[in-house]
Structures are given as structure tokens and as C-alpha cells.
Curated annotation (Swiss-Prot):
Despite a weak sequence similarity, retains most of the structural features of the ancestral archaeal Top6B subunit (AC O05207), including the transducer domain that interacts with the SPO11 subunit and the ATP-binding fold, also named GHKL fold. It comes from the Eukaryota. InterPro entries: MTOPVIB_plant. Keywords: Chromosome, Cytoplasm, Meiosis, Nucleus. GO terms for cellular component: condensed chromosome; cytoplasm; nucleus. GO terms for molecular function: DNA topoisomerase type II (double strand cut, ATP-hydrolyzing) activity; protein-macromolecule adaptor activity. Its main location: nucleus. This is Type 2 DNA topoisomerase 6 subunit B-like.
Length: 473
């Protein structure tokens, strides 16, 4: 089987349904996937089990599943799903066989003899099937799916994958996927707070390939710059509304990152989640990303690389030591729902822009446009001149008044302290003015005096390719 083979896609559909059943349950749940390959046959056959302790399945989940028995001329499976399921209130465990090759409804599903629970109270579902082909083609997509799904930090669900090849205990491998215990939001945290925390971990642990933060690339999570945005779509007529959440994490890598084989290559990965499940980035989201005015944030988008829904953004003149990660999550206000409507371009653009503006507002002099960066390049000299005027004056009353205006209570303050403070204030005002609508920017007042001069002190020369202003030291 190849990477685009139908069986891995079918498995991810079945795992997605199992995860939703666990997420909707009120209790702690477990989702376990077992791949048990017999090496005695040629080609080898793999028995697959997807088990969860969620709310119990609705057989309608299997109505639209399709998976051919053959791929590229070779038989890949027998087309049969075995399902056993029960709800907490049921007295029995129900067994079914589902033939995915059958299109006639009453022939597609066959009920098997059920089993009494003898008064036991539990719920859960197990789906089993057998396939032919390479184990690697099955394992890699499942691991990638689990690595992304824990970004959402759904705390009541634990995930594990067991891989067996042959009967020897040495040929068994177990993968357990868990959220970072050191930085876990509480159960009452909002979906957005969970997404922010989960994306931070995803960055620090190199796409969750590591169990802990990469010490080569990061010192601690406090150095991450995080912005978030939310846009809501109200219910309208018979259309169920939804919420678009966007989180952007930007990090400066340590110099030792050159020793890390997993360090970033300057590209920005875009993660997309649809109703709490990892999903390929839809075309509307791609269009929204292309329509963002990235230059307003000091970024120059060079290319959008779409690899079957796995999307990377590439930048021009981008610092090699900077990493950007973007996560988009769209979910309906009511779930489950039969509607498949997603967010429009305008909603996606607004969510991304809100996250960028939030990041910009939280960090002074960060993500400034090229024009504002040019203005900021003059700020150190301006602050140095103002501080010089204050401290060179022999009029102590004048000094005291100036320091008081700046918020200092004593004339014993150091000149460097005053100079740095003036720099920060000017950069803050520049950033605030840049976040205003364009019509308000044009009428922005002067920083230190009232004036009506329309003289421009700076040319419109572009300074591109820088993502934040020079450090204020």
C-alpha cells in the first residue's frame, strides 16, 4: 500500500469517530488502536482493532464509509468491518458485521447475536478489520494524527497505539500520546486556552515528536510570543453557527539549534482542525492566508506550499532563527450536526488578522510594518537626544518637571533608565498608531507637541523582510 492508499484513510475516519465518542462523554475515556501483524503469510495480514470507552456508536456513522477491496491491482482487505458497541444504559453488548462494498442498506449491515452485560454498567465501541500490506503505511498516518490531535488538549481522552509484528515480545511497540503535565490547562479552560497551550507544546516538542521540550532549540516557553483571535458566526435560519479560533506562536531559536536534526527550516506549518479533529487545510483557508496583508506585519509571503492539505508558508528575507506556527480551529456551536458548512474567507481572514493584531499588541515593537520599522530606526537617537536635553539642563526645576511627566519621582534616576523608558514609550505609540484604522493614522498627533505641519520627516522607502524592530537596549 502507498501513502495515498484508501485503507489508511479509512482507519483515520474510524479513529476520528472513536475520538468524538470519547470527547462527548462526561467521564475519562481511552482510545486504543492495535495493529497486530502476522508475518507467517505472504503478503502479511494485519488485524486492526480500534477501541474506545466513549458514549457508544450510532450505526449511522458507518453509512457513508467506503473503501475498495483492491488498490493498484492488489487485494488490500476483505471489505468487512466487525463492530461491537454498547451504551451505559444498555443491557447488552451489540455485535454487527458491516460490508462496505454493499450499497443496499438492508444488506450492508447484519446484526450478530448480542451478549448480556449481566448488570454491568459501561459503554464503549470496538471496530475490527483485517488488511494486507506494509505496516509502515498504517503506522505513520496514525502517529501523525495523534501528534496533532493532542494539540487540542482534550483532557478526558488518553490515546495509545500498540504495534505487534509476530509473536515475539521484542517485536511489540507501544506509543502513548499525552498532554504536557507541566503546563496542562484545567478542565474548565476554554477551547481557545487549550489550543494556545497545545500549540506551545507542539512547537517546543517539535510537532510532538518529543516527550519534553527540545533543549537545543528553546530555553523555556516564556520566550514564546503567542497571539490568538476568535470570530463567531451566529445561527442563521436553519444554518448552525460556529466559532473560528486562530493561534499563532512565534519563537526565537537558540544558537545551539544547529545541533538539532528537527530544527525548523524557516517554513511555517499551518494546522487545521474541523470540529475538534485534525483536517487537511481547506481551499478557502488557503485563499484567506494568501489574501492577508502580511507586509503590514513585516512579513513577505513568498509561497504557499500545499501537499495534499498539509500546508507550509514560505517567507522572503526571513530570519533563520525564527519559527512561526499557525493553528486554525473551526467548530459548530452545536455538535453533532448533519450540516457540513465551514467558515467563509472573510471569517477566516478576520480570525487570522485578530490573532496577528493580538500578538502585535502584546509585544512592543513586534511585527511592525516596514514603514513603522523605518520610523523605529530613528527612535534610539531621538530618545538619546531627549534624555540629553533633560540631564544637561542646569535648571533643577525643569529637570524635575520633565522627570515627573515621564513618571519618575526622583531626580536621582539614571540617564540610561530614562532613555530606555522614552524608547519604549515611543515604540509603544508607534505600534498603537499602526493598529488604528488607516483614516485615524493619517490624523495621528505628534508625540511631544501639538502641530499642524504636514511635513513628512521620513521618505516612503520600504524596509522589508524584518519581522520586528531592533532591540531596545
Amino acid at each position: 500500500m502507498e501513502n495515498n492508499a484508501p485503507v489508511p484513510k479509512l482507519l483515520l475516519q474510524l479513529i476520528s469517530s472513536a475520538f468524538q465518542r470519547c470527547r462527548l462523554a462526561e467521564d475519562l475515556c481511552r482510545l486504543s488502536v492495535l495493529l497486530d501483524q502476522s508475518t507467517e503469510r505472504d503478503p502479511p495480514i494485519t488485524c486492526i482493532s480500534i477501541a474506545d470507552t466513549g458514549i457508544g456508536c450510532n450505526l449511522e456513522e458507518f453509512q457513508n464509509l467506503r473503501c475498495p477491496r483492491e488498490f493498484n491491482g492488489a487485494k488490500i482487505w476483505d471489505g468487512l468491518l466487525s463492530v461491537k458497541t454498547t451504551c451505559f444504559t444498555d443491557d447488552e453488548v451489540y455485535y454487527y458485521h458491516i460490508n462496505l462494498d454493499e450499497y443496499i442498506a438492508n444488506k450492508r449491515l447484519k446484526r450478530q447475536p448480542s451478549q448480556a452485560k449481566n448488570g454491568a454498567k459501561f459503554s464503549g465501541t470496538e471496530v475490527s478489520l483485517s488488511v494486507f500490506g506494509s505496516m509502515d503505511v498504517l503506522v505513520a498516518p496514525i502517529i501523525g494524527f495523534f501528534q496533532k490531535i493532542i494539540v487540542l488538549q482534550i483532557l478526558n481522552v488518553t490515546l495509545d497505539l500498540m504495534v505487534k509484528q509476530g509473536t515475539s515480545p521484542g517485536n511489540q511497540t507501544q506509543y502513548v500520546f499525552a498532554v504536557n503535565a507541566d503546563k496542562t490547562p484545567c478542565f474548565t479552560a476554554s477551547n481557545l486556552e487549550r489550543l494556545k497551550s497545545g500549540l506551545e507544546d507542539y512547537v517546543l516538542r517539535h510537532a510532538n515528536c518529543l516527550d519534553t521540550m527540545c533543549d537545543y532549540c528553546f530555553s523555556d516557553r516564556e520566550h514564546l510570543k503567542v497571539g490568538s483571535g476568535t470570530v463567531c458566526q451566529e445561527d442563521k435560519h436553519k444554518r448552525v453557527g460556529g466559532t473560528m479560533e486562530v493561534v499563532i506562536v512565534i519563537s526565537d531559536l537558540l544558537e545551539s539549534t544547529q545541533h538539532c536534526s528537527r530544527s525548523c527550516n524557516g517554513k511555517t506549518e499551518v494546522l487545521y482542525f474541523d470540529n475538534f479533529l485534525p483536517s487537511p487545510v481547506p481551499h478557502l483557508a488557503l485563499s484567506a492566508l494568501k489574501k492577508i496583508d502580511w507586509k503590514k506585519y513585516g512579513l513577505i509571503l513568498a509561497n504557499v506550499n500545499d501537499q495534499d492539505g498539509h500546508v507550509f508558508l514560505e517567507w522572503d528575507n526571513f530570519p533563520s532563527y525564527v519559527q512561526i506556527q499557525i493553528a486554525l480551529h473551526w467548530y459548530h456551536n452545536q455538535y453533532p450536526t448533519r450540516q457540513k458548512n465551514g467558515p467563509g474567507i472573510s471569517l477566516l481572514k478576520k480570525g487570522i488578522k485578530n490573532a496577528l493584531d493580538n500578538l502585535k499588541a502584546k509585544h512592543e515593537g513586534f511585527l511592525l510594518s516596514s514603514h513603522s520599522r523605518k520610523i523605529c530606526s530613528y527612535v534610539p537617537d531621538l530618545a538619546r537626544s531627549i534624555a540629553g536635553l533633560i540631564f544637561s539642563s542646569t535648571d533643577l526645576d525643569f529637570q524635575g518637571d520633565c522627570l515627573s511627566v515621564l513618571g519618575f519621582q526622583t531626580q536621582e534616576v539614571e540617564r540610561d533608565t530614562v532613555e530606555n523608558y522614552i524608547q519604549r514609550k515611543i515604540v509603544t505609540v508607534i505600534g498603537m498608531n499602526e493598529r488604528k484604522p488607516q483614516k485615524d493614522q493619517e490624523a495621528a498627533p505628534f508625540l511631544f507637541f501639538d502641530g499642524e505641519s504636514e511635513t513628512s520627516f521620513f521618505e516612503d522607502e520600504e524596509v522589508e523582510g524584518e519581522y520586528y524592530s531592533s532591540s531596545l537596549e
